[in-house]
A protein has these predicted regions:
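Conserved N-terminal beta1-alpha1 strand-loop-helix module at the mouth
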Residues: 1-92, 109, 169-170, 197-207
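Glycine-rich beta-to-alpha transition loops that act as phosphate-gripper elements at the mouths
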Residues: 26-29, 74-80, 96-99, 116-121, ...
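Active-site phosphate/pyrophosphate- and oxyanion-stabilizing loops and adjacent acidic/basic residues
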Residues: 62, 150, 173
Length: 207
């Protein structure tokens, strides 16, 4: 299984070679998918995450993953059941808020790429011991943000992070300047309230 995970690390290197910001979408209505698809295509955004926080989340993944320009990830991934459902609707990778044996085993048996969520050195060590080197650092700003990531670089030189939680237009460039930050993830580019309001003009302005 570890060899499969090591190969998966290379998958993420390919996904995020040129795109260092991962938009996080929370979609309540399916018709939003078409508008968001247009906006992403206009702005060269190919990789993004749809969270499993709404009733239509899996349908939204299914709709947007049918566009061959997109690599759609599933967020808020927590159980083996989540994994199976996500794979069935076309998700190409998963991102979790934390770690568990069920999550690791479910992703590994299905060769499903995972960015596990970590918040402590212990969780980093557990993930690294299974071969995971690309990790979600969550919730980033609450855990110390920039300074915490700098502190983690020494003991974990082989790990790289996707800080998530509190990342915004004012601080994302500072995070990206860190050598152990692979990319940043956040909803500031596509705020849920603007999606719910269908304020596509404002979202275009932000992006």
């Amino acid at each position: 299984m570890r060899e499969n995970v090591l190969k998966i690390n290379k998958v993420f290197q390919h996904y995020f070679l040129t795109q260092k910001i991962l938009p996080i979408l929370t979609i309540e209505e399916l018709d939003s998918c078409n508008y968001l698809s247009d906006i992403f295509l206009e702005n060269g955004i190919k990789v993004f995450e749809i969270t499993l926080r709404t009733k239509v989340a899996l349908e939204a993944i299914n709709v947007m993953s049918k566009n061959k320009n997109f690599i759609v990830g599933v967020g808020t991934l927590m159980t083996d059941h989540n994994i199976q459902n996500a794979i069935n609707v076309g998700a190409k990778f998963g991102i979790s808020p934390g770690i568990s044996e069920e999550l690791f085993e479910g992703c590994e048996k299905n060769n499903f790429p995972l960015i596990p969520g970590v918040s402590t050195p212990t969780e980093i060590m557990v993930s690294y011991s299974r071969g995971y080197k690309v990790l979600k650092f969550f919730p980033a700003t609450v855990l110390g943000g920039i300074e915490m990531l700098k502190a983690l670089e020494g003991p974990f030189p082989d790990c790289c992070f996707f800080p998530t939680g509190g990342i915004n237009q004012n601080n994302f460039k500072t995070y990206l300047s860190l050598s152990n930050v692979y990319g940043v993830a956040g909803s500031w580019m596509v705020p849920k309230d603007l999606i719910d309001q269908k304020n596509w003009k404002k979202i275009r302005e932000i992006i």
